[in-house]
From Swiss-Prot:
TM ranges: none
Compositionally biased region (Polar residues): 1-19
Designated name of the protein: Chromosome partition protein MukB
Function field: Plays a central role in chromosome condensation, segregation and cell cycle progression. Functions as a homodimer, which is essential for chromosome partition. Involved in negative DNA supercoiling in vivo, and by this means organize and compact chromosomes. May achieve or facilitate chromosome segregation by condensation DNA from both sides of a centrally located replisome during cell division.
UniProt-annotated binding residues for ATP: 65-72
Keyword Coiled coil among record annotations: yes
Subunit structure: Homodimerization via its hinge domain. Binds to DNA via its C-terminal region. Interacts, and probably forms a ternary complex, with MukE and MukF via its C-terminal region. The complex formation is stimulated by calcium or magnesium. Interacts with tubulin-related protein FtsZ.
Coiled coil: 370-495, 536-616, 662-697, 865-1173, 1238-1293
Domain free text: The hinge domain, which separates the large intramolecular coiled coil regions, allows the homodimerization, forming a V-shaped homodimer.
Residue pairs linked by disulfide bridges in the UniProt entry: none
Organism: Haemophilus ducreyi (strain 35000HP / ATCC 700724)
Length: 1503
């Protein structure tokens, strides 16, 4: 933020920065500074110019040549090196005709050759530094015809090195163009500084700093202005682009003033926003305090209630568990008593269950025996049927085999006859085909040969022929006879073996049924062994019934003995003894009776001690309750005391420390108040000094500005406002007290006005002089080392030393202002801190006073909770002793009950102790059980396999010989028959050959002999067919008989399988029953069942009597069980509550500790209130909170979620949310803490201080409408004077009929009305400028609309319009006028001027712009540098000779360079002229250049 004086100071600074230094005012500018000049332009690898340097004349350089000679290319290279921005470059004379837009390459692509190209400018600045700047250009392949441009610069290049040699190197007899990387490597180790630029802004900044450009081109907008100026210069005429925006070109932007106003408005806006925020904070302070107080009450009350409930639940759970354990102990005692009474019932139940199970077993056994008897009858019946079917099956099998053999014989005989019939048929067919004798003989011969080959093949005799045929036939017939005899023998043996096979198979099957599958060779030995052991097994099976009766008797006796042993073992286990005999048991019984009497006496003493402990417990409880009543007040006092200790950063041990701290706070408050007042005075003094130094014209007294305006003069400080910081001490000492003088043109004219002045300084200095051409020749002065001697007159000298802190000139004032503002900011910060300390000490003293009046008498008492803890420990110790007494009582009672139980058990054991004498019962029982097990196994074996062994005995001898050889015999028989068949075939083949023996010697026979043979064959065929039919009939009969026998066999086999399967199932069932099925077993089982039934009836009668006696005891046990379940259920329920509360409490603790709010919630003073009281506090706070957070959705939702009593952690989350909400809402620039409670405390301290400070600051920041009008008018006046001075340089310009050019600047009528309203009528518009809702810019816009109601502002925002109205350029209209002929001064327009006149007028305007830019940028450039001035002019032939001379004269007078292009030499006697001619040599195009130095210039110099 800044005050009004700071606004004017900033305004003056910025306006003075923008104010150009006119030559008459340039006090510190040396006269011998040479202007920078462009020395040459070098084009490398351009179209027509491989390496060409154009040296520029100091004034005018002319490029002469015909169309296409390269003039435009040369100028394009210059412009490209000057402004390497492809977005701006556009060379018109190479664009497409009739196109609405320029070509893609902007006219640059076609001017370059492939490869690396350079456009380089060589410049010598005012410091005589040689500077080389340029661009590297390179065509980019593609249809877009783009060009890549990279700017660079070279410094410290020796004057002797040519530019071309820098960018090329010689390779043999050719030159190579170097790339940028090559250039960098070339100059890397030399003194030459090579620097490429990646930004056009950096490139232009370099050129501006070294005096190549007249203006710093900071942005693309500045580059656009400069390019438009160059373009207008290049193509000549009056550029509409420039004339329409002359204000942008000639009037500097007074951004400092506008920015100052914007900063001021921002400061005012921020100040007002801060005030509003303070008011909102002040209004919300009570709400914040109310919110945090109610939230603390709401959450802490529930927090402490949950803590108390959790503690109560834990105590209740422990009590429930104690009750549960007590009930369980009582139940154990009652159950122990029940055990003694119920053991007898248990024994009876056990006996009854045993008898009942035995009775059920006996009944089931009887049923099994009867079922087995019925199964045995079925087995016998099915066994007979199976045997009969088996015999029939064997007989049918034998008959079937015989019929099968008959079928096979008939089939073989039929096949043989079929073969013979087929052979006869083939012979007949052959004989019929051979009708003549030769054919018949040949056929017979062939058949004979075939028969011989068949015999050779069949008999395996390859050497068989007619000679040995008879021998072989005889031999094979003998073999056939032998094999026939052998077959007959085998048939006889096979029929005999078939009879023995049936008996062996039956005996073998019986053995397998008894012993399982065994080898056939072992069947005889297995059968012998089974038949040998079978009589003994039958005898042992008969003894099973007697053994069962004996085993039952032994089992009953063994059970009685085991019962006594079990009772003794149980007694020994309970009593931890090892008593086994009757004497030891009797002695132990007497000892236990004596011990029981002693325990009863000790129990009486323990009961008396328990009553004493209970009295002491009641006394301690009363003391504890008394302390609990005083604890809340003590905790409240200690909480307040802790808060005070944190605020005071001290520890209070007693009440004297509190009183001492109060006195200390009073002392600190007085000291801080004195310091605050002193800093306020220092800050005010610095602000006043800054305000004086911030005046726009350097006047220490604001009245001087009004006087200067009234007297029509200018303040001397304003004339010297641009003096440098180095010259400031000299001029300050030179003028002394007169440095605040007013410079007027005529003192005599001012003298009359002096007498009328009423409000002016005591000493007013007036100096006569021209304000537009004032210098320091008023005084005769002599400068010494650090002082100056001023000769006021011949008799009066003034000696003045240079001031240590000069204040003459804007630069000196700005430097001192920086120091003063820094000091003022430090003082302001210290003042704010002191004011805060004053408020803090006041608040601390107030809090201490309240504490003394409320809590001092109780805060330093001993901690009640510590005393309560001591009492609790003592009470806990007494409770432990009381519990110990109760436990001792319970233990003694248990011991007594235990002794009683032991005595009761001994009463049951002693009558039965004599049964322990018999020690052989167990051995006899095991022996009898083993005998019975063996007898039952034999009985089962006999029952299952006795019938099989009975059938096996008669035929067992057949197992001695194995009929399996029958199969081998049958195999030999089949093999012999096969051999017989083969031999018969061989014999038949040899017989056939023997019959055809004559055919081998066959000769021709007559026809009748062939016919007789055919008839013989047909007769044989008919006989063979008849025999074949008979054989087939016999085969069909045999097959029908075989089918019939086979069906009978299948039916017999199915019946056998069904009967046998049923037999096996019955045998399996009787095996599963495991009993013997005979009449003796049935009678024995029936007797056993009746006996057990009688015993069971006696036991049940006894049991009914005992159950009536146990009813009372069981009812008591049930009552105790119900009580135990109830207490256990209550304990589990209470424990679940504790566990759930613990989980929730842990989450609450975690949230509160992680968020550092536990100390806020753990209010110990609330721990002593009841749950209803705490709930009431929480409910009241909840109602208040609902109203407080009704407008905050987040807090409202959090509060609603916290109302769930099942989740207390939500309340802590709500408290944390409130903390976070307050932490975010409280201004961190005002409050110096993150804790909302501490922030509210600091807010109380800070609010009043900030309100006073910001209110006073707003008064300082208030912007005066009259001051704004004065600033705008002064700025407008200064710029008007500058434009008038620029017009002086255009007085002698003449082009054709144009005899003069000037700039006319006027104030717009609407804006003039606005200025008048601001300065003279500001009282009428207070409603705008004093409104808190409008900024100054908005108020200014509203005033503009009010005083100009006829103007339509459109939809623009008032803020935007107001910002434009703060720019003085919008108040001015700037036009160019020309003096032409009889028309006088008229507005310069191209339509009213000839081409030459327009070119000259446009050039004059451009010169004014360039000069204006130089003056505007003078303060941003070094003082020893004057920038280069160069303009272009293409097609200059349109100017006449007088206009050309005018241009040359203008260039000479303004020290400017001009580059002209024309088809002809327009003025060869002036400047330097280059003749350009484009030629083609050896298919290479190049531009021939001839330079001519102006001879007229040389003659003038010589003369």
């Amino acid at each position: 933020m800044m005050n009004t004086n700071e606004l004017f100071d900033q305004t003056a600074v910025n306006s003075s920065q923008d104010k150009p230094l006119n030559p008459p005012f340039a006090v510190a500018q040396p006269a011998n500074i040479a202007r920078g000049k462009f020395r040459s332009l070098t084009l490398i690898n351009w179209n027509g110019f491989f390496a060409r340097t154009f040296d520029f004349d100091e004034l005018v350089t002319t490029l002469s040549g015909g169309n296409g000679a390269g003039k435009s290319t040369t100028m394009a290279g210059f412009v490209t090196a000057l402004i390497p921005d492809l977005t701006l470059l556009n060379f018109r004379n190479t664009t497409e005709a009739g196109s609405t837009s320029s070509s893609r390459d902007k006219g640059l692509y076609g001017k370059l050759k492939a490869g690396v190209c350079y456009a380089v400018l060589e410049t010598v600045n005012s410091r005589a530094q040689r500077i080389i700047t340029g661009v590297r250009l390179q065509q980019i392949a593609g249809r877009d015809k783009k060009v890549d441009i990279r700017p660079f610069s070279l410094q410290n290049v020796p004057m002797a090195d040519s530019v071309i040699s820098l960018f090329t190197e010689q390779v043999a007899n050719k030159a190579r163009v170097l790339s940028l990387n090559d250039l960098k490597e070339k100059f890397e180790e030399t003194a030459v500084t090579f620097k490429p630029y990646h930004s056009i802004t950096d490139y232009h900044s370099f050129m501006f700093d070294l005096g190549i450009l007249p203006k710093r081109l900071r942005s693309s907008s500045d580059r656009n202005k400069f390019y438009k100026l160059i373009e207008a210069s290049l193509y000549g005429g009056i550029s509409s682009v420039i004339t329409k925006s002359l204000r942008d070109y000639l009037l500097p932007e007074n951004s400092g003033v506008r920015q100052a106003f914007q900063d001021m408005e921002a400061a005012l806006r921020e100040n007002r926003m801060t005030l509003e925020a303070i008011k909102v904070t002040q209004s919300d302070r009570d709400m914040f305090k109310h919110l945090i107080t109610e939230a603390t009450q709401y959450v802490s009350a529930d927090y402490m209630r949950n803590a108390n409930e959790r503690r109560g639940n834990v105590v209740s759970a422990l009590a429930q568990r104690r009750t549960w354990y007590d009930t369980k102990a009582k139940l154990l005692v009652e159950e122990q008593r029940l055990i003694e009474f119920s053991r007898e019932v248990a024994d009876i139940n056990l006996t009854e269950q045993s008898l009942e199970s035995e009775y059920n077993v006996a009944n089931d056994h009887l049923n099994l025996v009867m079922n087995a008897l019925r199964h045995q009858e079925k087995i016998i019946r099915y066994q007979d049927e199976v045997d009969a079917l088996n015999e029939k099956l064997e007989q049918q099998q034998i008959a079937l085999e015989e019929v099968s053999e008959q079928v096979e014989d008939a089939q073989a005989h039929t096949d043989e006859i079929d073969d013979r019939v087929d052979g006869l048929r083939s012979q007949i067919a052959d004989y019929q085909q051979a009708l003549d004798a030769q054919q018949t003989r040949a056929l017979q011969y062939q058949q004979a040969i075939t028969a011989l080959q068949k015999a050779q093949q069949l008999c395996a005799l390859p050497h068989l022929d007619l000679d040995n045929l008879k021998d072989y036939q005889t031999e094979f017939e003998a073999q056939a006879q032998d094999i026939t005899d052998h077959v007959f023998e085998l048939e006889q043996r096979l029929s005999i073996s078939d009879m023995t096979k049936t008996q062996f198979e039956k005996a073998y099957q019986l053995v397998c049924k008894v012993s399982g599958e065994i080898d056939r060779s072992q069947a005889w030995s297995e059968a012998t062994q089974l038949l040998a052991t079978f009589p003994d097994q039958k005898m042992q099976a008969a003894q099973a019934v007697a053994l069962r009766q004996k085993l039952a008797d032994l089992e009953q006796r063994l059970h009685q003995q085991q019962k006594v042993q079990r009772l003794i073992a149980e007694f020994n286990q309970q009593a931890a003894k090892k008593l086994t005999d009757f004497t030891a048991l009797e002695n132990h019984f007497e000892q236990q009776q004596i011990k029981l009497e002693d325990l009863e006496a000790e129990l009486a003493n323990v009961i008396e001690l328990r009553s004493v402990h209970r009295q002491q417990q009641e006394q301690l409880t009363q003391q504890y309750n008394q302390l609990a009543k005083t604890a809340p007040a003590w905790h409240t006092a200690r909480s307040v005391l802790t808060r005070l200790e944190e605020q005071c950063a001290e520890q209070f041990e007693n009440s004297q420390a509190i009183m001492h701290c109060m006195q200390e706070m009073l002392r600190k408050e007085r000291e801080a108040t004195l310091e605050r007042d002193e800093l306020a005075r220092t800050e005010a003094a610095l602000a006043s000094q800054i305000s004086q130094l911030s005046q726009a014209d350097g006047a220490e007294d604001i009245r001087l500005n009004q006087l200067a305006e009234r007297l029509g003069g200018v303040l001397l400080s304003e004339l010297y406002d641009d003096v440098s910081l180095q010259d400031a001490p000299y001029f300050s000492a030179l003028y002394g007290e007169a440095r605040h003088a007013i410079v007027v043109r005529d003192l005599t004219s001012v003298k009359a006005q002096l007498e009328k002045l009423t409000d002016c300084p005591n000493d007013l200095y007036l100096i006569e002089g021209d304000p537009t051409a004032f210098d320091d020749t008023v005084f005769s002065a002599e400068e010494l080392y650090d002082s100056v001697i001023v000769k006021v007159s011949n008799r009066q000298w003034r000696y003045s030393k240079f001031p240590e802190v000069p204040l003459f000139g804007r630069a000196a004032r700005e430097k001192h202002l920086i120091t003063l503002k820094t000091e003022r900011d430090d003082i302001a910060e210290q003042h704010a801190e002191s004011a805060f300390n004053v408020q803090k000490y006041q608040r601390l003293h107030q809090h201490l006073s309240q504490f003394v009046g409320t809590h001092l008498n109780i805060a330093f008492q001993p901690d009640p909770e510590m005393l309560m803890q001591e009492i609790a420990l003592e009470r806990q110790e007494i409770e432990g002793q009381l519990n110990q007494a109760v436990e001792n009582e319970h233990y003694l009672r248990q011991q007594a009950d235990h002794l009683k139980a032991e005595l009761q058990m001994l009463n049951k054991i002693l009558p039965l102790a004599n049964t322990l004498a018999d020690e052989t019962v167990m051995e006899r029982f095991e022996e009898c059980r083993e005998q019975l097990q063996s007898a039952e196994e034999n009985e089962l074996f006999v029952r299952q396999f006795g019938q099989y062994l009975t059938q096996l005995a008669p035929i067992a001898t057949s197992l001695q010989t194995d009929p399996s050889k029958f199969e081998q015999l049958e195999h030999d028989y089949q093999q012999a028959k096969s051999t017989q068949r083969i031999l018969q075939q061989k014999v038949f083949a040899l017989s056939d050959v023997m019959q055809r023996r004559l055919h081998f010697n066959y000769s021709e026979e007559n026809q009748c002999e062939g016919s007789a043979l055919t008839e013989q064959l047909r007769t044989d065929l008919a006989l063979a067919q008849q025999e074949r039919e008979q054989a087939r009939q016999r085969l069909r009969q045999a097959q029908a008989q075989f089918t019939q026998y086979n069906q009978v066999l299948i039916s017999l086999r199915s019946a056998y399988d069904a009967k046998y399967q049923m037999l096996q199932e019955l045998m399996q069932e009787i095996d599963d029953l495991g009993v013997r099925g005979d009449s003796a077993a049935e009678e024995c089982a029936r007797l056993r069942r009746d006996e057990l039934q009688q015993q069971l009836s006696q036991q049940r009668a006894r049991k009914g009597y005992l159950d009536k006696q146990l009813g009372i005891i069981e009812a008591e046990i049930d009552n105790l069980n119900r009580l135990l379940r109830k207490t256990e259920r209550d304990y589990q329920t209470q424990r679940e509550l504790v566990v759930q509360a613990k989980a929730s409490w842990c989450l609450v603790q975690k949230l509160s500790r992680n968020s550092d709010v536990e100390k806020r919630l753990n209010r110990r003073e609330l721990a002593y209130q009841s749950a209803e009281e705490l709930r009431s506090i929480s409910d009241k706070a909840l109602g208040a909170l609902r109203t407080a957070v009704a407008d905050n959705e987040y807090l409202r939702d959090s509060l609603r979620a916290s109302e769930d009593s099942r989740k207390p952690e939500n309340k802590v989350a709500f408290f944390i949310a409130v903390y976070q909400h307050l932490r975010e809402r409280i201004r961190q620039d005002i409050i110096r803490t993150d804790d909302p409670i501490d922030a509210i405390e600091q807010m109380e301290i800070e609010l009043s201080r900030l309100i006073n400070e910001l209110t006073s600051r707003e008064k300082k920041l208030a912007i005066s409408a009259e001051s704004v009008a004065n600033i705008l008018r002064k700025t407008i006046q200064r710029e008007q004077n500058r434009i008038l001075q620029l017009n002086q340089g255009l007085q002698n310009i003449a082009f054709g009929q144009v005899k003069g050019v000037r700039l006319v600047v006027n104030i717009r009528d609407t804006h003039s009305i606005l200025l008048n309203a601001l300065s003279d009528q500001h009282e009428q518009h207070k409603d705008l400028f004093e409104s808190q809702k409008l900024s100054f810019s908005e108020a200014l816009a509203m005033l503009y609309k009010r005083v100009n109601p006829h103007i339509e502002l459109g939809q623009r925002m008032p803020q935007t319009i107001g910002e434009e109205l703060l720019d003085y350029r919008n108040y001015l209209d700037l036009e160019v006028e020309t003096l032409r002929g009889a028309d006088g001064w008229m507005r310069a327009e191209s339509s009213a001027l000839s081409t030459g006149e327009a070119i000259g007028t446009g050039m004059s305007i451009l010169l004014m712009v360039v000069q204006s830019w130089e003056e505007e940028s003078r303060r941003m450039r070094a003082k020893d540098i004057l920038p280069c001035r160069l303009l272009f002019l293409d097609e200059a032939a349109r100017l006449d000779a007088m206009s050309i001379n005018t241009l040359f004269e203008l260039c000479e007078r303004l020290d400017m360079q001009l580059l002209i292009a024309a088809p002809e030499n327009i003025s060869p006697e002036h400047g330097t002229t280059y003749k350009l001619v484009r030629k083609i040599l050896a298919n290479q195009e190049y531009v021939h250049v001839v330079g001519l130095k102006g001879f007229g210039q040389q003659m003038n110099k010589s003369t």
